[in-house]
């Protein structure tokens, strides 16, 4: 899972680099933003996992469906 996120982040940063050649200050700020975004995503995932384990009713299925939707979103953005 983290491998996929790394590739995704690299792709984002690669796109930004091509947009912002020669603007180093802006580029490094953008990279920091991307890192914060990744950390936020990881945080959400672990919280979701805790909720899943906590609540073993129908929530597990919903959480699984949410992950599948995220994967579809990622696949669509990759194109």
Swiss-Prot record:
Provenance organism: Saccharomyces cerevisiae (strain ATCC 204508 / S288c) (Baker's yeast)
Biased composition (Basic and acidic residues): 8-20
Chain ranges passing through the membrane: none
Region of interest (Disordered), residue spans: 1-79
Domain of life from the UniProt record: Eukaryota
Protein name per UniProt: Protein SIP18
GO biological process, one term: cellular response to water deprivation
GO molecular function, one term: phospholipid binding
Note: Present with 2300 molecules/cell in log phase SD medium.
GO CC annotations on file: cytoplasm
């Amino acid at each position: 899972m983290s491998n996929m996120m790394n590739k995704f982040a690299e792709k984002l940063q690669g796109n930004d680099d091509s947009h912002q050649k020669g603007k180093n200050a802006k580029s490094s700020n953008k990279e920091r933003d991307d890192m914060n975004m990744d950390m936020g995503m990881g945080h959400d995932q672990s919280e979701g996992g805790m909720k899943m384990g906590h609540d073993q009713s129908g929530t597990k299925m919903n959480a699984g469906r949410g992950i599948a939707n995220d994967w579809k979103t990622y696949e669509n953005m990759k194109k």
